Swiss-Prot record:
Xref: PROSITE patterns: COA_CT_NTER (PS50980)
ZnF start-end (C4-type): 38-59
Gene Ontology cellular-component annotations: acetyl-CoA carboxylase complex
The protein, known as: Acetyl-coenzyme A carboxylase carboxyl transferase subunit beta
Source organism per UniProt: Streptococcus pyogenes serotype M5 (strain Manfredo)
Residues that bind Zn(2+): C38, C41, C56, C59
Main location per the UniProt record: cytoplasm
Location within or outside the cell: Cytoplasm
Homology family: Belongs to the AccD/PCCB family.
C-alpha cells in the first residue's frame, strides 16, 4: 500500500441535484416566430414592426423575402397570371438526395421551382415577370429555372411585353452539373432576341445575387436596379482574395459598391420599387 497519494489536479465537485432541477421552471418561453434578429445591426425586432416589406426599423436592412411576398408588394392585386407551372426537374444525373431536397423545398416554399414566372400588371402597366426565391435551394439555377425564364422572354417577344426580373441566387445548381451551366448561355440568348425586338428588360438585384445568374441575365438588363446592401457578385470574397492576393474593401460586392463602379444604375428602397418599375416601363414604351 502506498504511503503517499498523488495530489488531484482538479477540484472535485459533487453535483447539486437541487439546483439542477430548479432552474427556469417558471420562466415563460418566447415563441421564435415573435422576434427576428437583424443580420446587419444585430437588434432583436418584434416581427410586426418589420411590416409587410420586412425592413429593419433600426438600420433599414432589407430582410430576404419570399417570391409570394415580393409579388404582393409589387403587382396590382389580382393581376398575376402564373405561367409554366408544368415544367419539372427530371434529375438527369440521378444525384443522391436531390429528389428529396426538391420535395422539401416545394413543401417549404409552396413553389414548383426556384423562380416564379408569369404576367402581371404594375400600376396599370402589363409586364412579363420573374421572381427568384432564395428559400428554394438558394434559388440555384437548374434546367427548369433556365427553361422557365427562357420561355418568359419568348412569350414577351410574342406579346410585345417588357420583362422584369427580381434576381436572387447562389449560382448554378450543382446537382444538375453541366446542364445547369448551359442555362447561362440559353437565357442570355433569349435576352438578346428580346432586345433585338426592341423591347425593354429591367433587372432588380436582390440579396443575394451570385454565381452564374450574376454572370448572365442578372447583369444584362437595359436598366439594372438593386435593393440597398444586397450582396452581388460572381465568386466568393475569400476565393477572390486568395486568387488576387489582396485584401478587398469591406463593402466589396455590396450594391452600393457596384453602383459606385458603374455596374448598377440605381439603388431603390424596397417600398419604392413598385412606383419605380411602373415609371420605367411606361417611359420605355409601356406594356399595354
Amino acid at each position: 500500500m502506498a504511503l503517499f497519494r498523488k495530489k488531484d489536479k482538479y477540484i472535485r465537485i459533487t453535483p447539486n441535484n437541487f439546483l439542477k432541477g430548479s432552474v427556469s421552471h417558471n420562466v415563460p418561453e418566447v415563441p421564435d416566430e415573435l422576434f427576428a434578429k437583424c443580420p446587419a445591426c444585430k437588434h432583436m425586432i418584434y416581427k410586426k414592426d418589420l411590416g409587410l416589406a420586412k425592413i429593419c426599423p433600426t438600420c433599414s436592412y432589407n430582410f430576404r423575402i419570399s417570391a409570394q411576398e415580393r409579388l404582393t408588394l409589387t403587382v396590382d392585386e389580382g393581376s398575376f397570371q402564373e405561367l409554366f407551372t408544368s415544367i419539372e426537374t427530371k434529375d438527369p444525373l440521378r444525384f443522391p438526395g436531390y429528389q428529396e431536397k426538391l420535395q422539401k423545398a416545394k413543401e417549404t416554399t409552396g413553389l414548383h421551382e426556384a423562380v416564379l414566372t408569369g404576367k402581371a400588371m404594375v400600376k396599370g402597366q402589363q409586364i412579363a415577370l420573374a421572381i427568384m426565391d432564395s428559400h428554394f435551394i438558394m434559388a440555384s439555377m437548374g434546367t427548369v429555372v433556365g427553361e422557365k425564364i427562357t420561355r418568359l422572354f419568348e412569350l414577351a417577344i410574342e406579346e410585345n411585353l417588357p420583362v422584369v426580373i427580381f434576381t436572387a441566387s447562389g449560382g448554378a445548381r450543382m446537382q444538375e452539373g453541366i446542364m445547369s451551366l448551359m442555362q447561362m448561355a440559353k437565357v442570355s440568348a433569349a435576352v438578346k432576341r428580346h432586345s433585338n425586338a426592341g423591347l425593354f428588360y429591367l433587372t432588380i438585384l436582390t440579396d443575394p445575387t451570385t454565381g452564374g445568374v450574376t454572370a448572365s441575365f442578372a447583369m444584362e438588363g437595359d436598366i439594372i436596379l438593386a435593393e440597398p446592401q444586397s450582396l452581388v457578385g460572381f465568386a466568393g470574397r475569400r476565393v477572390i482574395e486568395t486568387t488576387v492576393r489582396e485584401n478587398l474593401p469591406d463593402d466589396f460586392q455590396k450594391a452600393e459598391f457596384l453602383q459606385d463602379h458603374g455596374f448598377v444604375d440605381a439603388i431603390v428602397k424596397r417600398t419604392e420599387l413598385r412606383d419605380k418599375i411602373a415609371h420605367l416601363v411606361a417611359f420605355h414604351g409601356g406594356g399595354q
